[in-house]
C-alpha cells in the first residue's frame, strides 16, 4: 500500500471527529500525485483532455492523469495552483467506487489528487 494512502486513511480515521463521510459521485480529473495536478493546472487552457495528454506524455505514463466517472471521498485542501487564467484548489480524494454499466461498483480505496476550480471575482 502506498504511504500516502496510509496517511490519508489515518488522517480520515483519527484526526477528525467521528462522523460518516459522504461519498461524491461523478466525473473527476484525477492524478496519481499532487505534483501532476500542479503541472496539469500549468498547461490547462480550457481543454482538459489536452492538458491530461501533456502531463501523461511528460510522465511517460498514459495513466498518470485521467478523466473518469468515480465515487470518492474528498479530503482537505493541500494546495492552490494557478495558471495565467485559472486558479484551482488541490485536494486528495480516496476513490471508493467506479461507474460501470450496472452502476457504481466498490473498489479497494485508492488515493489520488484532483483540482477544483476556484471561482474568482474581479474587483
Where are these predicted regions, by residue range?
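Serine/threonine-rich, low-complexity intrinsically disordered segments
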Residues: 15-16, 116
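Boundary regions of SH3-family modules and the immediately adjacent low-complexity/disordered segments
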Residues: 22-28, 94-123
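Residue "hotspots" at secondary-structure boundaries inside conserved domains
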Residues: 63-65
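SH3/SH3-like beta-barrel superfamily modules
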Residues: 68-109
Amino acid at each position: 500500500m502506498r504511504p500516502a494512502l496510509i496517511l490519508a486513511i489515518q488522517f480520515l480515521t483519527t484526526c477528525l471527529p467521528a462522523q460518516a463521510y459522504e461519498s461524491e459521485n461523478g466525473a473527476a480529473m484525477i492524478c496519481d500525485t499532487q505534483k501532476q495536478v500542479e503541472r496539469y493546472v500549468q498547461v490547462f487552457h480550457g481543454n482538459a483532455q489536452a492538458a491530461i495528454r501533456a502531463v501523461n506524455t511528460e510522465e511517460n505514463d498514459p495513466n498518470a492523469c485521467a478523466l473518469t466517472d468515480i465515487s470518492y471521498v474528498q479530503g482537505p485542501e493541500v494546495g492552490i495552483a494557478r495558471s495565467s487564467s485559472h486558479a484551482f484548489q488541490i485536494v486528495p480524494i480516496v476513490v471508493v467506487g467506479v461507474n460501470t454499466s450496472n452502476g457504481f461498483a466498490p473498489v479497494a480505496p485508492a488515493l489520488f489528487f484532483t483540482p477544483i476550480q476556484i471561482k474568482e471575482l474581479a474587483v
